[in-house]
Amino acid sequence: MNKLIFTLAGLIAPLVMSSPLPQPAELLATNTVIAVYEKTVDRPCMHLTSLCPDRCNHAKKLATFRVITNENYKRTGKYGDDKSEPGSLVYVDMLHDEPGQSENVRKLIAELKPGDAVRITVDHYYVTGNCKYPVRPVTIERVEKPANIPPAKAEAPAMDIMPLAR
């Protein structure tokens, strides 16, 4: 019986990882920004659980984008993400796709060079089915680089202590 359960779990796991947005889901906020790609950072596992480092999925490969302008922001729920201010950073995980996110996002980021400008739209959903959790799928498209690029914020947090919403 246990072998059957593990076999079924192994067959279903890839479907869950690259799945569409779970339903029902409530849209809490939408944030569209023009940003400049800076770099990709490897963030190792911090070894905080018994599953670490082999089976925990804590390690991240983060693409870092600096926000230039905020084109569109709409908060439809009480707990939606805040508006991204010019000079702030947006991180996109390159190792794991969010549910509802196109697989082309990682392909496009892999082609980017530091200084390339993109339009990033982050939709903040809250899944309200049997399990309740946030989902933030990202869409990215190339745009022309704007002339006025704000400097980096001085109070940017250190990369190794910044929490990720996952």
Where are these regions (language model features)?
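Short nucleic-acid-contacting surface segments enriched for D/E, G, S/T with interspersed K/R
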Residues: 100-121
